[in-house]
Regions:
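Active-site proximal loop and beta-alpha junction motif in alpha/beta enzyme cores
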Residues: 1, 6-181
Length: 181
């Protein structure tokens, strides 16, 4: 995921004294370039624009709060009314794990109180139900929030137990995420 790529870049820079500002990773999903600028690690990725979709019954039945909008790209994107709904959202794992959306997951999002938007990311049938910080989910989140808020530069917060702040830039067919180590 994007967050792990940024963490790997940080390890190379901070602990192995990698001399360049740009680091190129060859991955199964293609080449990922990380740039270190102004104390932040930046990663440029292709966007994944979601299309309106029906919510699968297994997902709907697993949620304690139903979304107001549903989109599908690689992941399902569930849009909620408020940050409070995202914070209090619970998933009944035994029901949620009945759906197979491999390699995707479920993103839940809403307008943030102290950021442009907040999110959480869940993966059925995975060893960890909720990912702490998910760079790849922002490939879908950034185009959605760009269109809704009409802002190219966005501040995001992932509300998992560990959580994280993500800088986001909409670049047409691509998105850029950045964060500190």
């Amino acid at each position: 995921c994007g967050h792990a790529t940024l963490a790997t870049a940080h390890c190379l820079k901070a602990h192995l004294n990698y001399p360049n500002e740009d680091i190129c990773f060859k991955t199964k999903s293609g080449t990922l370039n990380v740039c270190f600028k102004n104390g932040l690690y930046e990663l440029n990725l292709p966007n994944r624009v979601g299309k309106p979709a029906a919510l699968p019954g297994e997902i709907a039945n697993a949620l304690n709060i139903q979304p107001k909008e549903v989109y599908k790209a690689r992941d399902y994107l569930l849009v909620y009314q408020s940050q409070t709904e995202i914070e209090t959202l619970k998933i009944e794992r035994s029901i949620f794990d009945q759906i197979n959306i491999d390699p995707g997951g479920v993103i839940v999002t809403a307008v943030g109180k102290d950021s442009d938007f907040v999110s959480r990311f869940f993966t059925p049938q995975a060893s960890i139900l909720e990912d702490p910080v998910t760079g790849s989910s922002h490939c879908t989140l950034i185009p959605y929030w760009f269109k809704r808020l009409q802002k190219k530069e966005l501040k995001a917060k992932q509300l998992s137990k560990r959580g994280g702040d993500i800088g986001c830039i909409y670049k047409g067919s691509r998105v850029q995420i950045n964060g500190a180590a």
